[in-house]
């Protein structure tokens, strides 16, 4: 059984027991999170597709960790001007473990 849900403007395909990295959620470690915007649920041959969401379906997860991703560097380089600008960025994320899919 797996489901596709939306969080942080992105869609994620998950099954029970899977650990997923999402955009930062304002939840503490150990808290339970419910995602109601489930777009599709597949259970063997039974497929439920939402228009736009599946009514009554939700994905339940537990927050495992909060953290920051790898650093990316942004460089603006102007040739022949002896000028460059460098900036770094680390995106916050939340790791959740999927504990249940209810359809």
From Swiss-Prot:
One of its GO terms (cellular component) is ribosome. InterPro entries: bL21-like (IPR028909), bL21-like_sf (IPR036164), Ribosomal_bL21 (IPR001787), Ribosomal_bL21_CS (IPR018258). SUPFAM superfamilies: L21p-like. It comes from the Bacteria. Keywords: Ribonucleoprotein, Ribosomal protein, RNA-binding, rRNA-binding. Coiled coil: none annotated. It holds the Pfam family Ribosomal_L21p. HAMAP family: Ribosomal_bL21. This is Large ribosomal subunit protein bL21. It comes from Mannheimia succiniciproducens (strain KCTC 0769BP / MBEL55E).
């Amino acid at each position: 059984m797996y489901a596709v849900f939306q969080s942080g403007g992105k869609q994620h395909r998950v099954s029970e027991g899977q650990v997923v990295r999402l955009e930062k959620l304002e939840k503490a470690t150990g808290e339970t999170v419910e995602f109601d915007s489930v777009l599709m649920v597949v259970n063997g041959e039974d497929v439920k597709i939402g228009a736009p969401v599946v009514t009554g379906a939700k994905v339940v997860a537990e927050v495992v960790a909060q953290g920051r991703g790898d650093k990316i560097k942004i460089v603006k380089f102007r040739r022949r001007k002896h000028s460059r600008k460098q900036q770094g960025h680390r995106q916050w994320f939340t790791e959740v473990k999927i504990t249940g899919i209810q359809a």
